[in-house]
Each structure stands twice: as structure tokens, then as C-alpha cells.
Amino acid sequence: MRLGPYQYLADMVVMHYHNSSLNDVENKQRRRCLVAIAGGLGSGKSTIAGHVRDRVEEQGLKCQVVTVEGFLRPRADLSEEQLNKRGAIDTLDGDAVLHMVQDLRDSRPGEDVHLPGFDEHTRETVPDGQVIQPDTQVVIIKGTYILANAQPWRKIGGLVDERWFVFVMPDVARERGARQYLDKGIVGTEEEAFRRYDEIGVYTNKYVNRHSCRVDVVIENNDDTVPLTE
């Protein structure tokens, strides 16, 4: 029987975890398995990560999904131009994201890790808004630029076990991106949503499509079939 794409990805993660070396030999503990999933606005990172998490947990491993949106730089530190395109790569604290991934890499099940979160309603970061639980064995880290080839982001790829990129066609990304702006209350009308995407979102998606590091899997998420390319 042919495996579905989410099950295939989950099986890869579980295999990585069980095949990882026992770095902490004295306590016989495997380190956490880390997966980075990148993709532009409207690519479906959150949906894919959620499906994979559920299937990983069905196989007996505790899995959590975290976002890097909590690492947005404070508004006071941004120029007017940056405020207008908040969410672009230069409005995120890339060094802090890199340190977060390193901390997760060095941590072991049995240790909790506190991370900043992001409130979708207020559009503000939340200190300690995300907590990796002590018994978590797999962490899926999602972020638009998590696998960008710009410094310091490009160092992240060497710290994770799996690197996935979600690709969508431009017209699909535009429709989904505009819908996200509406659903999150960033704009009030469909016309404003498409205008914002054409002024901001399209450049974000072009950037990540052109400036991402080498990945292990490309996920083409243009419809419900979600084909994979290794």
C-alpha cells in the first residue's frame, strides 16, 4: 500500500530519532530530533507540520511544533519601512533564532526549553509563549526563513536532522496569502488583502524560493495531494 505524504514524512522523522547515536552514553539518552520546515506565505507549513506531528505521536514519540515568529524584533527597533513589512527577514532576530536551535540541539528529553511565542490576534510576541516539554523527543521548527542561505540563518541547516521546504505556485500562494491576511484581521477587505500581498507578500515568497539552503525534501503543496521530492 502506498504511504500518504504525511505518513512518509513522519516515518522519516521516527527513523531519524531511533537511529540517532546515543550522545549521552552515561544516561543512555538520545538527543531530540529536530526538523526545520520552511516556505513562503500561504505555503501550508503549519498544516503540514501539524499532520506530521500527529502521525509521529501515533508511533509513540512525543512531538511538538514551534514557530520562530516569536523572534520578531521589537517595534521600537524597526524603521518605518521595516514596520510596514514586518515579518521580512530583516525584522527577525536571526542570531536569537540560531541560538534557540542550538539550545534545542544541546537539550535532552527531561529538560524543558522556554521560547518566545507570537499572538496572532495582537500580532505581538509573547515572552515564554512556547515551552518544549521535558518529555518531548521530536521538535518541528517552522519558519519562513528558517532555512534561508543568508547569515546567520544558513547555519541552522547544519543543526537539524531534517530540512524540508514547502513550495507553492505563485498564483496559489497569492490566493492563500491574501486569505491569511483576512483571516488574521490584518486587513478588512479582500481588495486590501490582495493589495497587501502584491506589495509585501509576493516579495517574501520570491525571496525564500530563491534564497534557501539545500534541503532534504521539497514538498509541493499546490493541492491536497502534497507530492514530495527528495
Locate predicted features:
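Extreme N-terminal, non-catalytic leader segments
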Residues: 1-36
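Walker A (P-loop) phosphate-binding loop of P-loop NTPases
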Residues: 42
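Conserved lysine of the Walker
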Residues: 45
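Hydrophobic positions on the alpha1 helix immediately C-terminal to the Walker A/P-loop
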Residues: 48
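Post-Walker A helix-loop "phosphate-sensing" segment adjacent to the P-loop in P-loop NTPases
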Residues: 54-64
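Conserved nucleotide-sensing/catalytic segment adjacent to the nucleotide-binding pocket
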Residues: 64, 73-122
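ATP-dependent NMP and nucleoside kinases share a basic, alpha-helical "lid"
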Residues: 122-183
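Small-molecule kinase domains that catalyze NTP-dependent phosphoryl transfer to phosphate-bearing small molecules
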Residues: 128, 151-154, 182-230
